[in-house]
Amino acid sequence: MTTVAIVGGGPAGLSTALFTAKNGLETTVFDTDGTWMHKAHLFNYPGIGSVDGSVFIENLRDQVNSYGTEREQGIEVSDVEGTDDGFTLRTDEGSYDAEYVVLATGANRDLAESLGCAFTDEDVVEVDVTMETSVAGAYATGAMVRTEEWQAVISAGDGAAAALNILSNEKGEHFHDFDVPDDADRVFGDLVDDD
């Protein structure tokens, strides 16, 4: 059983994988390579002046691979159902079990519907601020939760929010993924008020 199963290999799914795998959770991404990023060129992603969408996705894949993410490339998830201890994902190749599932399938909301997630009046998946759906342990991100406001940077943020909530649940306390250089105290001083 994997800890986190992510359905979708675009900005939201790979962002989730980056945070969860980097922080030690066993993570599997099911990626059919159907991301809209292959039709995009990014000029509006903070910190990146300009990048082809396909290059951006390849860079993200390399990054999540470096943290040990298991990527099931080309495998489509046909169904997700809740179990007593998480979720079962079904594919043509077999079944996979996970403690958490993150749905990052763009505007395709079929898996969320079959899982029993609540929808809003606008027919998008209803989530809280952590991207968790009405089904405990199931998260939805990106275009699944918005009618029109689809941007790579928003989707990546959704994936990060889902990942941080999963990490907080697993660690039993609020979790933040800050990478601090070893010499931060020397460079920046003591930024923590002990009072």
Located regions from the model:
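A conserved FAD-binding loop/helix module that cradles the flavin
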Residues: 141-185
